[in-house]
Amino acid sequence: IDVSASFSPDAKKIVFNSDRNGRRHLYIAEADGKNVRRISREGGSYYTPVWSPRGDYIAFVKNIRPDFYIGVMDTNGDNERIVVKDFSLESPAWSPNGRYLIFYRQQRSNSDGTGGETTIHFIDITGYNERIIPTPRDGSDPAWSPLL
């Protein structure tokens, strides 16, 4: 199944994840669906790819049990690097200037079996300067507003 499509800023290409080879990997295709090629090369399963606003990177979630990672790579799959690692990380979204990622982190379940707290964070794409975005309650699925 092909899921989680994200258009390039010029709308000429899409990146998506697919289990077409057994494990979830990232693929790029022309906007019309032609010329599909796999770009992820490392181990683990890849999810939720998002094209950067400048079109130079793709952010993604990666799972190598038991941990989740948020990383970035060049649009051809080269130079994959991990930005942050934890128990559960989801929903990376680019800042309008392409220098930061916002995402949410879920803590491990509480001892009574209830889900752990979820918090929204942002971090620069080098993996430094991580900060929590204060929210009145748990937060998930963050998004940036566009530059005006």
Annotate the PLM regions.
Residues I1-L148:
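Sequence signature of WD/YWTD-type beta-propeller architectures
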